[in-house]
């Protein structure tokens, strides 16, 4: 679904000249903010006034965290969506992925972990929510917190060292900001060289254990991500004027 061919990707990647890349990097904050959370979901809550974290110090103060530890963002999924649409995944479904991930990070104290529920959980009305899994598994682990619903995810990329997603859109968004992103299953953007893709659970859990050692992405890797986003935004997707523009709630007026 909307996955560009490797041949087309390689063509765009090679054509992306250094001057163009420099301009993209200089405008990466704007390009990033235009894309993160703009798929369909956050648009629903657009009218709500949300709080922005001002700094990493502000984040750590909010959660009572140590300023010296890196922050890793884990982006949860809707557990009833996208479980059978990939050719490979390290886990049976997104529910298992989150549960097993939390069980592992409970033992990793060198990192502050923040889990963000999917913004459209309440629309799908799943019987199990991210909060349920969090409450079941997280006890007195002070370095594992839920992202507060009162706050906006925009600009949070400035305060984190890495991102983890099963196979969500974050995998082609955060690498634009040189943030290493681990994915656990096939996606439209997997295999193009800008995400970390463990081949087994053992390798994935090892990455989690060593995640505080992961370095920022280099310019060539970021370039690969921009090449994909160019294809995704301007080539692969085409608006059809006859279709009504709406959001996932499907509430027509």
Residue ranges and their predicted role:
Residues 71-73, 111-114, 145, 161-164, ...:
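Beta-sheet entry/capping signal
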Residues 79-84, 120-125, 153-156, 171-173, ...:
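Flexible loop/turn segments at secondary-structure boundaries
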Residues 149-196:
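A donor-sugar binding/catalytic signature common to diverse glycosyltransferases
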Residues 1:
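Conserved nucleotide-sugar donor-interacting segment of glycosyltransferase catalytic cores
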Residues 34-135:
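Conserved catalytic-core segment of nucleotide-activated headgroup transferases in glycan assembly
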Residues 131-148:
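Nucleotide-activated donor-binding/catalytic signature segment of Leloir-type glycosyltransferases, i.e.
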Residues 8-69, 202-253:
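C-terminal amphipathic helix plus adjacent low-complexity
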């Amino acid at each position: 679904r909307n996955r560009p061919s490797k041949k087309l990707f390689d063509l765009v990647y090679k054509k992306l000249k250094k001057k163009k890349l420099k301009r993209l990097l200089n405008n990466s904050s704007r390009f990033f903010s235009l894309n993160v959370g703009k798929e369909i979901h956050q648009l629903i809550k657009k009218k709500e006034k949300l709080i922005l974290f001002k700094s990493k110090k502000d984040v750590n103060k909010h959660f009572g965290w140590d300023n010296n530890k890196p922050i890793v963002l884990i982006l949860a999924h809707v557990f009833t969506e996208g479980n059978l649409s990939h050719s490979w995944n390290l886990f049976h479904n997104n529910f298992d992925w989150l549960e097993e991930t939390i069980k592992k990070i409970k033992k990793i104290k060198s990192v502050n972990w923040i889990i963000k529920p999917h913004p459209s959980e309440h629309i799908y009305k799943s019987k199990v929510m991210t909060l349920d899994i969090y409450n079941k598994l997280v006890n007195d682990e002070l370095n594992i917190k839920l992202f507060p619903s009162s706050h906006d995810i925009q600009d949070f990329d400035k305060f984190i060292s890495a991102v983890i997603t099963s196979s969500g859109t974050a995998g082609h968004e955060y690498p634009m900001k040189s943030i290493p992103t681990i994915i656990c299953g096939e996606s439209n953007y997997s295999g193009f060289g800008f995400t970390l893709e463990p081949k087994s659970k053992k390798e994935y859990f090892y990455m989690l254990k060593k995640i505080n050692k992961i370095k920022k992405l280099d310019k060539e890797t970021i370039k690969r991500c921009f090449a994909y986003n160019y294809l995704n935004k301007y080539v692969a997707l085409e608006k059809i004027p006859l279709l009504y523009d709406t959001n996932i709630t499907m509430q027509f007026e």
